[in-house]
Amino acid sequence: MKHLLIIFSVLLTSISWSKDVDWKDLIKRDGLWYEKFTNEPFTGNSTGLKQGKVKDGKKDGEWLYYSVNGQLYLKNTYKEGKKDGERLKYYDNGQLMEKGNYKDGKRNGLKTDWHKNGRKESEGNWKNDKQEGLLTAWYENGQKRTEINYKNGKKEELQTRWYENGQKRSEVNYKNGKQDGLVTEWHKNGQKSFEGNWVDGKVDGVVTFWDKEGEVTKTDTYKDGKLVEGIKL
Protein backbone atom coordinates (compact mmCIF):
# COMPACT_ATOMS: atom_id res chain seq x y z
CA MET A 1 0.00 0.00 0.00
CA LYS A 2 2.84 2.37 0.91
CA HIS A 3 4.51 1.73 -2.45
CA LEU A 4 1.24 2.41 -4.28
CA LEU A 5 0.91 5.79 -2.53
CA ILE A 6 4.47 6.74 -3.54
CA ILE A 7 3.82 5.75 -7.16
CA PHE A 8 0.53 7.68 -7.16
CA SER A 9 2.28 10.77 -5.77
CA VAL A 10 5.00 10.61 -8.44
CA LEU A 11 2.37 10.25 -11.17
CA LEU A 12 0.48 13.30 -9.90
CA THR A 13 3.67 15.38 -9.88
CA SER A 14 4.55 14.19 -13.38
CA ILE A 15 1.08 15.02 -14.68
CA SER A 16 1.12 18.51 -13.16
CA TRP A 17 4.56 19.29 -14.61
CA SER A 18 3.49 18.01 -18.03
CA LYS A 19 0.63 20.49 -18.31
CA ASP A 20 1.38 22.85 -21.18
CA VAL A 21 -0.34 26.23 -21.38
CA ASP A 22 0.25 29.02 -23.89
CA TRP A 23 1.83 32.04 -22.20
CA LYS A 24 -1.14 34.18 -23.29
CA ASP A 25 -3.38 32.07 -21.05
CA LEU A 26 -1.32 32.79 -17.94
CA ILE A 27 -1.98 35.87 -15.81
CA LYS A 28 -0.11 37.29 -12.83
CA ARG A 29 -1.93 38.13 -9.60
CA ASP A 30 -0.28 39.24 -6.38
CA GLY A 31 3.12 38.07 -7.60
CA LEU A 32 1.97 34.58 -8.68
CA TRP A 33 1.06 33.11 -12.06
CA TYR A 34 -2.36 31.56 -12.67
CA GLU A 35 -4.04 29.94 -15.61
CA LYS A 36 -6.95 32.14 -16.70
CA PHE A 37 -10.23 31.51 -14.89
CA THR A 38 -8.57 29.50 -12.11
CA ASN A 39 -7.75 30.27 -8.50
CA GLU A 40 -4.90 27.81 -7.96
CA PRO A 41 -1.31 28.98 -8.61
CA PHE A 42 -0.19 27.37 -11.85
CA THR A 43 2.28 24.50 -12.04
CA GLY A 44 3.36 23.37 -15.48
CA ASN A 45 4.97 24.67 -18.66
CA SER A 46 4.47 27.97 -20.42
CA THR A 47 4.60 27.55 -24.20
CA GLY A 48 4.62 29.80 -27.25
CA LEU A 49 6.72 32.96 -27.31
CA LYS A 50 7.58 32.69 -23.59
CA GLN A 51 8.76 29.20 -22.70
CA GLY A 52 9.62 27.90 -19.26
CA LYS A 53 8.47 26.10 -16.13
CA VAL A 54 6.19 27.46 -13.44
CA LYS A 55 6.02 25.84 -10.01
CA ASP A 56 3.35 26.85 -7.51
CA GLY A 57 2.80 30.09 -9.42
CA LYS A 58 6.49 31.02 -9.62
CA LYS A 59 8.87 30.88 -12.57
CA ASP A 60 11.53 28.22 -12.13
CA GLY A 61 14.61 27.30 -14.15
CA GLU A 62 15.51 28.55 -17.61
CA TRP A 63 13.05 30.71 -19.54
CA LEU A 64 13.30 31.48 -23.25
CA TYR A 65 11.68 34.54 -24.84
CA TYR A 66 11.03 34.80 -28.59
CA SER A 67 9.93 37.63 -30.87
CA VAL A 68 6.87 37.21 -33.11
CA ASN A 69 9.16 36.12 -35.96
CA GLY A 70 10.58 33.30 -33.84
CA GLN A 71 13.91 34.93 -33.00
CA LEU A 72 15.26 34.21 -29.51
CA TYR A 73 15.92 37.56 -27.80
CA LEU A 74 16.21 36.73 -24.09
CA LYS A 75 17.22 33.92 -21.74
CA ASN A 76 16.56 34.27 -18.02
CA THR A 77 17.04 31.82 -15.17
CA TYR A 78 14.69 31.82 -12.19
CA LYS A 79 14.51 30.31 -8.73
CA GLU A 80 11.22 30.51 -6.84
CA GLY A 81 10.05 33.36 -9.05
CA LYS A 82 13.18 35.48 -8.77
CA LYS A 83 15.93 35.92 -11.34
CA ASP A 84 18.77 33.70 -10.22
CA GLY A 85 21.57 32.75 -12.57
CA GLU A 86 22.69 33.78 -16.03
CA ARG A 87 20.84 36.31 -18.18
CA LEU A 88 21.49 36.54 -21.93
CA LYS A 89 19.98 39.08 -24.32
CA TYR A 90 20.28 39.01 -28.13
CA TYR A 91 19.95 41.37 -31.09
CA ASP A 92 17.53 40.48 -33.89
CA ASN A 93 20.48 39.19 -35.93
CA GLY A 94 21.34 36.65 -33.21
CA GLN A 95 24.36 38.58 -31.96
CA LEU A 96 24.75 38.59 -28.18
CA MET A 97 23.73 41.97 -26.73
CA GLU A 98 24.06 41.44 -22.98
CA LYS A 99 25.41 38.86 -20.55
CA GLY A 100 25.03 39.08 -16.79
CA ASN A 101 24.08 37.26 -13.62
CA TYR A 102 21.46 37.54 -10.90
CA LYS A 103 21.29 36.22 -7.35
CA ASP A 104 18.01 36.17 -5.45
CA GLY A 105 16.46 38.70 -7.83
CA LYS A 106 19.34 41.17 -7.78
CA ARG A 107 22.02 41.77 -10.36
CA ASN A 108 25.40 40.50 -9.17
CA GLY A 109 28.77 39.94 -10.78
CA LEU A 110 30.14 40.90 -14.18
CA LYS A 111 27.80 42.45 -16.77
CA THR A 112 28.96 42.80 -20.36
CA ASP A 113 27.18 44.51 -23.28
CA TRP A 114 28.05 44.31 -27.00
CA HIS A 115 27.36 46.51 -29.99
CA LYS A 116 25.40 44.95 -32.84
CA ASN A 117 28.64 44.57 -34.81
CA GLY A 118 30.00 42.22 -32.13
CA ARG A 119 32.41 44.66 -30.51
CA LYS A 120 32.21 45.12 -26.76
CA GLU A 121 30.10 48.12 -25.68
CA SER A 122 30.50 48.15 -21.89
CA GLU A 123 31.68 46.02 -18.99
CA GLY A 124 31.43 46.40 -15.24
CA ASN A 125 30.59 44.67 -11.98
CA TRP A 126 27.42 44.73 -9.92
CA LYS A 127 26.79 43.95 -6.26
CA ASN A 128 23.28 43.59 -4.84
CA ASP A 129 21.74 45.44 -7.81
CA LYS A 130 24.22 48.34 -7.64
CA GLN A 131 27.23 49.06 -9.82
CA GLU A 132 30.53 48.49 -8.07
CA GLY A 133 34.06 49.23 -9.24
CA LEU A 134 35.21 50.24 -12.71
CA LEU A 135 32.75 50.51 -15.60
CA THR A 136 34.35 50.75 -19.04
CA ALA A 137 32.51 51.64 -22.27
CA TRP A 138 33.64 51.57 -25.92
CA TYR A 139 32.53 53.05 -29.24
CA GLU A 140 31.46 50.76 -32.09
CA ASN A 141 34.92 51.16 -33.64
CA GLY A 142 36.52 49.68 -30.51
CA GLN A 143 37.87 52.98 -29.19
CA LYS A 144 37.45 53.48 -25.46
CA ARG A 145 34.61 55.87 -24.66
CA THR A 146 34.31 56.09 -20.86
CA GLU A 147 35.85 54.89 -17.61
CA ILE A 148 33.78 55.44 -14.47
CA ASN A 149 34.36 54.22 -10.93
CA TYR A 150 31.41 53.25 -8.74
CA LYS A 151 31.03 52.57 -5.04
CA ASN A 152 27.73 51.19 -3.78
CA GLY A 153 26.00 52.35 -6.96
CA LYS A 154 27.34 55.92 -6.88
CA LYS A 155 30.06 57.51 -8.98
CA GLU A 156 33.31 57.77 -7.05
CA GLU A 157 36.73 59.25 -7.86
CA LEU A 158 37.77 59.91 -11.47
CA GLN A 159 35.56 59.61 -14.54
CA THR A 160 37.32 59.90 -17.91
CA ARG A 161 35.70 60.25 -21.35
CA TRP A 162 37.23 60.14 -24.85
CA TYR A 163 36.18 61.22 -28.31
CA GLU A 164 35.73 58.56 -30.97
CA ASN A 165 39.09 59.56 -32.47
CA GLY A 166 40.85 58.65 -29.20
CA GLN A 167 41.36 62.21 -27.98
CA LYS A 168 40.53 62.75 -24.31
CA ARG A 169 37.22 64.58 -23.88
CA SER A 170 36.84 65.17 -20.13
CA GLU A 171 38.00 64.30 -16.63
CA VAL A 172 35.53 64.67 -13.76
CA ASN A 173 36.05 63.82 -10.10
CA TYR A 174 33.24 62.44 -7.94
CA LYS A 175 32.64 61.84 -4.26
CA ASN A 176 29.62 59.88 -3.05
CA GLY A 177 27.88 60.36 -6.40
CA LYS A 178 28.43 64.12 -6.63
CA GLN A 179 30.98 66.11 -8.62
CA ASP A 180 33.76 67.05 -6.24
CA GLY A 181 37.13 68.39 -7.33
CA LEU A 182 38.64 69.45 -10.63
CA VAL A 183 36.68 69.19 -13.90
CA THR A 184 38.60 69.48 -17.17
CA GLU A 185 37.29 69.28 -20.75
CA TRP A 186 39.03 69.31 -24.15
CA HIS A 187 38.09 70.14 -27.71
CA LYS A 188 38.24 67.33 -30.25
CA ASN A 189 41.55 68.74 -31.55
CA GLY A 190 43.18 68.34 -28.12
CA GLN A 191 42.97 71.96 -26.97
CA LYS A 192 41.58 72.50 -23.49
CA SER A 193 38.02 73.89 -23.57
CA PHE A 194 37.01 74.16 -19.92
CA GLU A 195 38.37 73.90 -16.39
CA GLY A 196 36.71 74.47 -13.03
CA ASN A 197 36.29 73.15 -9.53
CA TRP A 198 33.29 71.54 -7.82
CA VAL A 199 32.54 71.05 -4.13
CA ASP A 200 29.80 68.64 -3.04
CA GLY A 201 28.05 68.81 -6.41
CA LYS A 202 28.27 72.59 -6.85
CA VAL A 203 30.67 74.63 -8.96
CA ASP A 204 32.92 76.76 -6.76
CA GLY A 205 35.68 79.19 -7.69
CA VAL A 206 36.99 80.35 -11.07
CA VAL A 207 36.00 78.47 -14.22
CA THR A 208 37.82 79.13 -17.49
CA PHE A 209 36.77 78.59 -21.12
CA TRP A 210 39.09 78.25 -24.14
CA ASP A 211 38.41 78.20 -27.89
CA LYS A 212 39.77 75.58 -30.30
CA GLU A 213 42.90 77.68 -30.88
CA GLY A 214 43.78 77.72 -27.17
CA GLU A 215 42.71 81.31 -26.46
CA VAL A 216 40.81 82.10 -23.25
CA THR A 217 37.31 83.32 -24.17
CA LYS A 218 35.63 83.65 -20.79
CA THR A 219 36.15 83.33 -17.05
CA ASP A 220 33.40 83.01 -14.45
CA THR A 221 33.58 83.02 -10.68
CA TYR A 222 31.17 80.91 -8.64
CA LYS A 223 30.46 80.57 -4.94
CA ASP A 224 28.48 77.58 -3.68
CA GLY A 225 27.02 76.99 -7.15
CA LYS A 226 26.02 80.61 -7.80
CA LEU A 227 27.61 82.95 -10.34
CA VAL A 228 29.44 85.81 -8.61
CA GLU A 229 31.26 87.35 -11.57
CA GLY A 230 31.58 86.70 -15.29
CA ILE A 231 34.15 88.16 -17.66
CA LYS A 232 33.92 87.63 -21.42
CA LEU A 233 37.19 88.26 -23.25
Give, region by region, the residue ranges found by the protein language model.
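Glycine/tyrosine- and acidic-biased, solvent-exposed loop/turn segments at the edges of beta-strands
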Residues: 13-233
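Sec-dependent N-terminal signal peptides
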Residues: 4-13
